[in-house]
UniProtKB/Swiss-Prot annotation:
Low complexity composition-biased segments: 517-570
Entry-linked InterPro entries: PNMA, PNMA_C, PNMA_N
Disordered, as annotated region: 111-199, 227-254, 508-580, 608-647
Protein name per Swiss-Prot or TrEMBL: Paraneoplastic antigen Ma6E
Biased segments, Acidic residues type: 625-636
Composition-biased stretches (Gly residues): 122-149, 158-199, 227-251
């Protein structure tokens, strides 16, 4: 049951079952960090791994987790239990694949018996002059092995053709070291090669001589079906080669002898430990194909595929989703579901080349906590769900479910926190505003007005910014979201220079909008106000006094010269400077009306007296002289304003 569960989970998760483990018995109350620590302590020495899924199983009464490793593992190193919360957790994995002998050898097609050893052994295992017995292996008249015979002078056993030390088969069938296919061992020693292998006519073995037709090479140049003795001279199924291509120790020729009636190989008929195989061991590890064995061929075939697939497996990281768990933890802020689901949809479009199984697998890898449990439960019930269906299900569970009235109340009651900056508050307020617009609680056409109203009501802007925003509100031209953020940034940059703000210098980035030509021409001089020498401090004090006088002055509706528009607002009454009356030290103060972003905190632009034009001074002089002419009682000399500076 556990193995079936492992295979099922790997199938719908798209995991490799050979590299995966199933952990059972995890208590339901086990915390996530406890699970991670226990798994890390037990499995991290084995290599890189990842937890694909973990959820509760009713039939087990506990949680189960699926873990996949990056590489194949040795089953003997995998722990069968993991110590954890509530007792040891059982580890389930597929059994080790049995190691089959010669599994690395390529499967060559069987060749018809009786073929020459040269064809069976290929280039490396050909008999040539030494391997193919032919005239040499026939043992001649004396049953010897000729030049390359199995035993040479010592191996020839007289007329009987004994096998000698090399254990040839029959009188002349012994091929010795060279008779069995040379050093490549293609034919073994029991049958020298080809049709004439082993004994020939003079081998004393007759027609059923030591190797016969099949005694030479067998199917693959080895030793026939079992090796060295062929059909008649061999030893049946368990003949000369056995499984290892050898001759066995005493069964190379069977109990009846490897050479039939005349094949005197001793009573045991054994070809010796080296019999029927020779030094090359007819089947050996090289598989009777000589030095160019099949192992090298297999490795050469696998290597290009490994080089091609390795980069593909390593470069999958760029397609991973950002993690999402919806787990509420103190001090851990996770991105909103709306932001994550948009990112997930974009990634699904990039994964268009991948199969649906891979898409679901990559989606599950990015999930955790409650989000992972939701999707895992859905896929367990219906494995045919697509990745988009999983995202839709997550949206139904985790998407904001606020009603129309709730979203409106959240927006209207949003206040600036004690340690929260104005910029961050406006950004947070915008999210609530957009959510209220989506729910239909706020008309989109009124969004800018409501945003500005909330900032003025529930935020803490500076005095200068508050005056600017109230002016925009009165003029019914509220800024947009980006415009408000830009205004806040400019105000923060302006406030970063206290010297300029204290001296009443207007904002550097904002142009001055005024209909007074003197103010418009004097605005470029504001940057040099702080560098005007000792008169700068006097000008600042005079500007402050002028501002107080302008605020406390009565309504100018008594005379014709009262300012009735922006032109009048651009002029102010000069004041008496007690510290001197020199024209070089007098300053002309100009009041700038707040018409836009140029409205500064102090609203004053300082201009040196000698830089100002004469028409504004003459206008001021006219305003000062009119009250003097209207006074019928006559004023004393001490009550008349000083006008010597204009003459």
């Amino acid at each position: 049951m556990a193995l079936a569960m492992l295979r099922d989970w790997c199938r719908w998760m798209g995991a490799n079952a050979e590299r995966s483990l199933l952990i059972l018995g995890i208590p339901d109350d086990c915390k996530e960090h406890e699970f991670q620590e226990a798994v890390r302590a037990a499995l991290s020495p084995l290599g890189r791994y990842r937890v694909l899924t973990k959820h509760f199983r009713k039939e087990l009464g506990a949680k189960a987790a699926l873990v996949e490793f990056a590489e194949y593992l040795n089953r003997s190193l995998i722990p069968h239990q993991i110590p954890g919360n509530g007792g040891p957790w059982k580890v389930i994995f597929l059994p080790q694949v049995p190691v089959i002998e010669f599994q690395d050898m390529p499967s060559f097609p069987a060749q018809p018996q009786g073929q020459a050893v040269a064809k069976a052994a290929g280039e490396g295992g050909g008999a040539g002059e030494a391997g193919g017995v032919g005239e040499v292996g026939a043992a001649g008249e004396a049953g010897g092995t000729g030049e390359a015979g199995a035993t040479g002078e010592a191996g020839a056993a007289g007329e009987a053709g004994g096998a000698g030390e090399a254990g040839g088969v029959g009188e002349a069938g012994a091929a010795g070291e060279a008779g069995g296919a040379g050093e490549a061992g293609a034919a073994g020693e029991g049958g020298a090669a080809g049709e004439a292998g082993g004994a020939g006519e003079a081998g004393g073995v007759g027609e059923a001589g030591a190797a016969g037709e099949a005694g030479g090479a067998g199917e693959a140049g080895g030793v026939g079906e079992a090796g060295a003795a062929g059909e008649a001279g061999g030893a049946g199924e368990a003949g000369a080669a056995g499984e290892a291509g050898g001759a066995g120790e005493g069964r190379a020729a069977g109990e009846a002898g490897a050479a039939g009636e005349a094949g005197a190989v001793g009573e045991a008929g054994a070809a010796g430990e080296a019999g029927a195989v020779g030094e090359a061991g007819a089947a050996g590890e090289a598989g009777a194909v000589g030095e160019a064995g099949g192992t090298n061929v297999t490795k050469a075939w696998v290597q290009p595929w490994r080089c091609t697939l390795q980069p593909v497996l390593e470069n999958r990281a760029y397609r991973e989703l950002r993690p999402f768990s919806r787990r509420e933890q103190p001090g851990c802020e996770e991105e909103s579901f709306e932001s994550w689901v948009e990112h997930a949809k974009d990634m699904l479009q990039l994964w268009c080349h991948a199969s649906e199984r891979e898409k679901k697998r990559w989606l599950l890898e990015s999930l955790g906590g409650p989000a992972l449990e939701v999707v895992s439960g859905l896929l367990e019930e219906d494995t045919n769900l697509s990745a988009l269906d999983c995202l839709a299900a997550l949206g139904q569970v985790f998407r904001n479910q606020d009603t129309r009235m709730t979203s409106r109340l959240k927006f209207l009651t949003c206040t600036q926190g004690p340690q929260e900056g104005l910029f961050a508050f406006v950004v947070r307020l915008e999210g609530l505003l957009q959510r209220a617009v989506e729910k239909g609680a706020v008309c989109p056409a009124l969004a800018n007005y409501l945003r500005l109203q909330q900032v003025l009501s529930w935020a803490r802007p500076s005095e200068a910014l508050q005056d600017t925003l109230r002016g925009m509100q009165l003029e019914k031209r509220p800024p947009g979201f980006l415009g408000l953020l830009r205004l806040i940034r400019e105000m923060e940059a302006w406030a970063a220079f206290p010297a300029r703000s204290q001296q009443g210098v207007a904002w550097a980035a904002a142009p001055v909008e005024s209909e007074d030509p003197a103010a418009a021409q004097a605005s470029p001089a504001q940057g040099n106000a702080s560098e005007a020498g000792p008169g700068a401090e006097d000008a600042a004090e005079a500007a402050s006094a002028t501002k107080e006088a302008a605020r406390g002055a009565p309504a100018a509706g008594e005379g014709e010269s009262a300012p009735a528009g922006p032109e009048g607002l651009g002029q102010a009454r000069p004041i008496e400077v007690p510290w001197g009356s020199s024209p070089a030290r007098m300053s002309s103060a100009v009041w700038v009306f707040p018409r836009g972003l140029s409205w500064g905190p102090e609203g004053l632009i300082q201009v040196r007296g000698q830089e100002a034009r004469k028409p504004p001074l003459e206008g001021l002089q006219t305003i000062l002289e009119e009250p003097e002419n209207e006074d019928e009682d006559g004023a004393g000399d001490e009550g008349q304003p000083k006008s010597s500076q204009g003459k």
